[in-house]
Regions:
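Beta-rich carbohydrate-recognition modules and glycan-binding surfaces
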Residues: 7, 24-204
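Bacterial N-terminal signal peptides
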Residues: 15-24
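Bacterial N-terminal signal peptides that target proteins for export
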Residues: 5-14
Length: 204
């Protein structure tokens, strides 16, 4: 039989080693989490009641269409953009966007959005000026019905467009100049639509 003292010592040593490994993993997880938090910045938080005054609706009625939409601020701290797309009178789009604000995103690499959709395709849009019309930068994404998604979009993947047409002679987006953020549905997707947005962040 072995020495009982040595056996006990080995058991204690084993416990100490396992404990140190566990603490190392926990500490690294905390560091990683903290790094992720500092690498992202919240741009739009619908828990903030001030956001209710910062969003506007722009539909195809500006060109004679009859599509309808609204943005609803939920008690859960999210916002719902919903409505109905009509193709009558050559219409077919609805959108919502934030009012002009200088976000000062120099040094950031892209946008991170948490969203729940309805299975239709949407566009995340940003603008670098405060004009009602003009150049915007879009990123197309598909949604899954009643499924929350995290969408990370590098600024390099935003495409400059004017009234739905890609502009090849426009400079790439300048993060430092971004002033408006929003969502748009088009592409002849007639009928009801609905997306729910939790937040919009910028990431490095």
């Amino acid at each position: 039989m072995g020495d009982p003292f040595m056996k006990k010592a080995r058991q204690v040593l084993f416990v100490i080693v396992i404990l140190n490994i566990y603490l190392s993993i926990v500490s690294w997880s905390d560091i990683t989490s903290a790094t992720m938090e500092t690498a992202e910045r919240i741009l739009i938080d619908f828990n903030n009641t001030d956001e209710k005054e910062n969003w506007q609706i722009i539909n195809d009625d500006v060109m004679g269409g009859v599509s309808q939409s609204e943005i609803i601020f939920n008690d859960t701290g999210t916002a719902t953009f919903q409505g109905r797309i009509s193709l009558e009178n050559n219409g077919g789009f609805a959108s919502t966007r934030s009012k002009s604000h200088s976000y000062r995103l120099g040094g950031y690499n892209g946008l991170h959005v948490r969203i729940q959709g309805d299975g239709k395709d949407y566009q995340l849009r940003v603008r670098t000026d405060n004009r009602f019309d003009g150049i915007s930068y879009r990123y197309r994404f598909a949604t899954q019905p009643e499924t929350w998604m995290n969408i990370r979009v590098p600024f390099s993947e935003f495409v400059p467009v004017f009234r739905g047409r890609i502009q090849s002679n426009v400079s790439p987006i300048s993060p430092e100049q971004i002033q408006q953020v929003g969502f748009l549905i088009s592409d002849k997707q007639a009928g009801k639509f609905r997306i729910e947005i939790d937040w919009i962040k910028a990431y490095k």
